[in-house]
């Protein structure tokens, strides 16, 4: 069964991996934001967000419920969109200063 401390060490390891993966995802979202900006597209893409949620829920094998994963990924998507918009604003500022 293992001790609480052993299980917490495993959770800490998973948390570090999640942070790495979330930051990797954020870098990809930033690159997509650059492309969207070049194409004149908004950071908000409801169709794509729906696809992401469907992909996530389709791969869920538990024990987290679909509702729990939906809430988590809605937040992840929201933060990615915020990052895209902030980066777009920052790039526009840099462009206008030239």
PLM regions with names:
Residues 1-98:
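Domain-level signature for soluble enzymes in the chorismate/prephenate branch of the shikimate pathway
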């Amino acid at each position: 069964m293992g001790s609480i401390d052993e299980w917490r060490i495993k959770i800490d390891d998973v948390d570090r991996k999640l942070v790495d993966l979330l930051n990797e995802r954020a870098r990809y979202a930033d690159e997509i934001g650059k492309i969207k900006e070049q194409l004149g597209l908004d950071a908000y893409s409801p169709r794509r967000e729906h696809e992401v949620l469907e992909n996530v829920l389709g791969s869920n094998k538990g024990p987290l419920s679909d509702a729990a994963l939906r809430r988590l990924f809605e937040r992840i998507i929201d933060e990615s969109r915020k990052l895209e918009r902030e980066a777009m604003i920052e790039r526009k500022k840099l462009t206008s200063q030239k």
